[in-house]
């Protein structure tokens, strides 16, 4: 085997779907679907990126500290950092060893959160003293970011269906010093008649395939199938159809 190693490792490039599936260790059905939507070159780059080790992103809690000041503190501890490309309050840490053990984390100066998640709240951009509804809210990264954008002024209703997830929202809000979030146990697939046309802004992080975080959880590739995608599509439609009814005329949903 060792003598024929190079020959054994060759992958037939004749079938482009098989080639990407084998080379980058992704299910064939997934590659096939992606190529139909995005084209071969994009999918090749996506698969390559999925196999890279992700960097840790944190969101600065600007209610307590500026990004510049926190950056200085982290650098003084030996952390290699840089600003996120698009999120205004994000920092990328290349060597996040024991990052949750430092005082700045315990004091609520930052929360671990992907840049893509930060951008959702940044786009919604709720005003102070607004009423915001955050559906499928746990663990509260977006809810606490929305509160931060609002200057901790107004009201945010954060809903999820599990008690332990609601507790995560409370814990994160408490550590960050945020007190405008009210957690509620509620199934987003059910319509709440009492909230129709009541909220100024609505954030919907509907249950999804998780394929966008393959770098962080590579096992997701093998825990999903085509049937899962169809079921999730139905769930998402029901939640979104309910959510749009809660927004006041002129309100915004992301």
Which residues make up each language-model segment?
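S-adenosylmethionine
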Residues: 1-254
């Amino acid at each position: 085997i060792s003598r024929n190693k190079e020959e054994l490792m060759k992958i037939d490039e004749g079938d482009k779907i098989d080639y990407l599936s084998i080379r980058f260790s992704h299910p064939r059905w997934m590659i096939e679907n992606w190529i139909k939507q995005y084209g071969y070159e994009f999918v090749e780059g996506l698969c390559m990126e999925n196999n890279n080790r992700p960097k840790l992103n944190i969101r600065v809690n600007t209610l307590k500290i500026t990004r510049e000041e926190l950056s200085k503190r982290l650098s003084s501890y030996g952390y290699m950092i840089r600003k996120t490309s698009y999120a205004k309050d994000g920092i990328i840490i290349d060597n996040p060893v024991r990052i949750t053990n430092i005082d700045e984390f315990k004091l609520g100066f930052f929360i671990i959160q992907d840049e893509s998640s930060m951008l959702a709240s940044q786009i919604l951009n709720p005003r102070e003293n607004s009423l915001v509804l955050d559906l499928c809210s746990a663990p509260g990264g977006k809810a606490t970011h929305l509160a931060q954008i609002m200057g901790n002024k107004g009201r945010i209703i954060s809903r999820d269906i599990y008690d332990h997830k609601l507790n995560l929202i409370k814990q994160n809000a408490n550590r960050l010093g945020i007190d405008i979030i009210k957690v509620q146990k509620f199934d987003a697939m059910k319509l709440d008649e009492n909230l129709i046309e009541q909220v100024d802004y609505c954030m919907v992080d509907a249950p999804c395939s998780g394929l966008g975080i393959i770098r962080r959880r590579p096992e997701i590739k093998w825990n999903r199938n085509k049937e899962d995608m169809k079921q999730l599509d139905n769930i998402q439609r029901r939640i979104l159809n309910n959510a749009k009814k809660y927004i006041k005329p002129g309100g915004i949903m992301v």
